[in-house]
Swiss-Prot record:
Extracellular side: 54-62, 153-186, 279-290, 379-385
Name assigned to this protein: Odorant receptor 82a
Species: Drosophila melanogaster
Cytoplasmic side: 1-32, 84-131, 208-257, 312-357
Record carries keyword S-adenosyl-L-methionine: no
MF terms in GO: ionotropic olfactory receptor activity; odorant binding; olfactory receptor activity
Lineage: Eukaryota, Metazoa, Ecdysozoa, Arthropoda, Hexapoda
Transmembrane segments: 33-53, 63-83, 132-152, 187-207, 258-278, 291-311, 358-378
Record flagged with keyword Ribosomal protein: no
Misc remark: The atypical heteromeric and topological design of the odorant receptors appears to be an insect-specific solution for odor recognition, making the OR/Orco complex an attractive target for the development of highly selective insect repellents to disrupt olfactory-mediated host-seeking behaviors of insect disease vectors. Odor-evoked OR currents are independent of known G-protein-coupled second messenger pathways.
PANTHER family: ODORANT RECEPTOR, ODORANT RECEPTOR 47A-RELATED
Amino acid sequence: MGRLFQLQEYCLRAMGHKDDMDSTDSTALSLKHISSLIFVISAQYPLISYVAYNRNDMEKVTACLSVVFTNMLTVIKISTFLANRKDFWEMIHRFRKMHEQSASHIPRYREGLDYVAEANKLASFLGRAYCVSCGLTGLYFMLGPIVKIGVCRWHGTTCDKELPMPMKFPFNDLESPGYEVCFLYTVLVTVVVVAYASAVDGLFISFAINLRAHFQTLQRQIENWEFPSSEPDTQIRLKSIVEYHVLLLSLSRKLRSIYTPTVMGQFVITSLQVGVIIYQLVTNMDSVMDLLLYASFFGSIMLQLFIYCYGGEIIKAESLQVDTAVRLSNWHLASPKTRTSLSLIILQSQKEVLIRAGFFVASLANFVGICRTALSLITLIKSIE
């Protein structure tokens, strides 16, 4: 298996970032760091210009708004990473160190080797799958105009040129060389969007899966704790478990803190995107190409939301299971002093570790709620038509 978070690290390095935790200016942002942010923000102008230019055509407006919202969400993700760049790299190093310790003979981690190894395989697979999904969606947008031009030339007919994204520039963007320049600009924006989505979203689900594995490791340690034992051994074991639990809770809260803007943006913007994309799906039922385009786009944005909801769900569930692990252990054989310490662990683990932003909680229940809303919108729009 490759290095932990390797794909996400490659995406970040492609965007000009590097692991500079030890650098004296690790908190400073240079032009290369913010160039991607400026580049993506600049794409809002031609997108909004397109909406304004076609304001009387609801189909074109909704088609463009779905891209506008995606671009806005990418701006939030880039800003989140730039603002918390050092924290991101610290968490990457922390989990890599914990993974190395799980393969060593350190007692705290040795018992959870299977959990951590399987978690890292799953995180690596999901990261690659998500990156491929985002890449294929972007590629589909890019190839659409090229395929259309190729088909027209094959049949010896003429057709109007189209940009990959619905954009309107302040110059003639449908004739050479303006068309080629705008096409290249759109491709570069798409590459940045895909790279940051793969990195930021991929890191979140990888962090969440690793946290779940370590919570499971902690549960196993508690359940397998053999009582009674000598007082020194008991204190060493208890100290190790408490420190491990505190570390996992700290990492969970840190994850929630640095991803708060992204979770908020993900829920708000996905809710808006669902409305406009469902409208496009329903109104383009007769066009197979358009239907495939918007169906893949819809699947991509729902996958992004699912990543956060699933990650939040597994962290919440496994953090609560520590309470169950203590109750399933042979705690009744422990000394009164140890029982008191175990009761404190129970109290601490009964507090839900929620990944939330405002009143939005990243959970599968909320994801299902948005899916139900999407189905209701389909029924509503079809009934109106």
